[in-house]
């Protein structure tokens, strides 16, 4: 909320609308990237409808995600792109902070890494399976993160529409999203 508050303080209300999505709060984060992305996309679409019903014209969109939220945001972009939103709304900024874009599997450098990969994927529900890339996305037979990285996917084609694509991460002392992710 600090980012939202800072942006709202900097820009006039009639020029900037900030939506802090709520549909994936609390334990809903365990439902996975796909379901979380669908819920968030619905929230974004509803907000756009409300703004336009109130006489506002939505002309640009920027999307920010933190940690798992960055992956959810990438999924949302694919859904919005597939529905044609970017034909009428200009995608400007896509930014993620501490997001494990490559998943969280540890390189197999010893038994503790193997144990982490096995237990993590099985104890963190759908989100864990997707982050550890042991899931199978729909009928593709491939993990969701692999599908989302495919250049021909709606996820990459939608992401490519954004004028600015930025990721921020720590290269040391970040145990939750380590450097190889």
Where in the sequence are the language-model features?
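Short, surface-exposed "cap/lid" segments of acyl-processing enzymes
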Residues: 1-27, 80
């Amino acid at each position: 909320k600090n980012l939202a508050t800072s942006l709202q303080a900097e820009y006039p209300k009639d020029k900037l609308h900030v939506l802090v999505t709520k549909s994936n709060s609390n334990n809903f984060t365990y439902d996975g990237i796909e379901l979380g992305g669908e819920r968030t996309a619905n929230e974004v679409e509803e907000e756009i409808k409300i703004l336009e019903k109130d006489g506002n014209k939505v002309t640009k969109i920027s999307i920010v995600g933190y940690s798992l939220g960055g992956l959810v945001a990438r999924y949302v972009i694919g859904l919005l792109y597939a529905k044609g939103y970017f034909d009428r709304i200009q995608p400007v900024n896509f930014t993620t902070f501490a997001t494990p874009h490559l998943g969280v599997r540890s390189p197999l450098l010893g038994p503790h890494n193997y144990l982490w990969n096995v237990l993590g994927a099985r104890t963190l529900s759908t989100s864990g399976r997707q982050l550890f890339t042991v899931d199978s996305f729909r009928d593709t037979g491939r993990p969701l993160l692999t599908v989302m990285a495919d250049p021909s996917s709606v996820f990459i084609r939608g992401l490519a529409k954004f004028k600015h694509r930025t990721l921020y991460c720590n290269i040391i002392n970040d145990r939750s999203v380590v450097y190889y992710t």
